[in-house]
Amino acid sequence: MKEAKAMAYVNMYGVLATLENLCAVDDEAKQILAELKSPVSLCFEVAGGPCGTFHFSKSGCKFTEGSEGCTCKMNFKSPEKFNDLIDNSKPGIPTKGVVQVLSFLMGPFTKLTNRLTKLLMPTKEDLQNRAFFEESTILTFYTIAGAISALANSDSISKFTAASTVDGVISMGIKDTCYATVKVKNHHFTTIKEKANNPRAVMEFADIDLAYGLFNGTVSTIAELCEGNIYMAGMISMVD
């Protein structure tokens, strides 16, 4: 059963936070940002849930925790209301920079999230394009990396696993393609979208095609481990 609060954190730190990566690698997203007249820092604050700000400029997107530096803000009365923004495009209540938040949300932000949705939920036809396939898989990787920490910190079942995870740094990645770091400190997980230095545990997939198969459940994790296509090292319990 899905927990609304945990899903709100996944939507913030997993799904929407991938806008950072979308804006860094996707040509359509870059074109949308190129048309911005001025930088916009949009904050979503969820009662009983996450609060984060998305800083957009012509050069890209940066996600930060909290509301510091926001130029416009939208509040949500509950995690369920915030999840409705993701699932049903239902906005919250503008509380700062009302004109800016509404114009940006209905314009550039919607264009960016629509593009992200297309890449994270591709059709079979979309995936026939190799460049699209690779970008889709890479963005899915970053979404999963963010969601891991979101669930570990907020989902009641995942917290049991987090409670037994030792402190340290986990490196995860697709070989020679993309990497993320998951830091564990006092059972709190933090995802950083860069390759780890001196990790305590490592999990690396051999290539993009393998990663796609694992993400979609079309290949066997055990079989690929036995074949040596999934590299694991260090404190394996952290990877588990």
Identify the residue ranges that each predicted region occupies.
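Feature captures hydrophobic
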Residues: 1-240
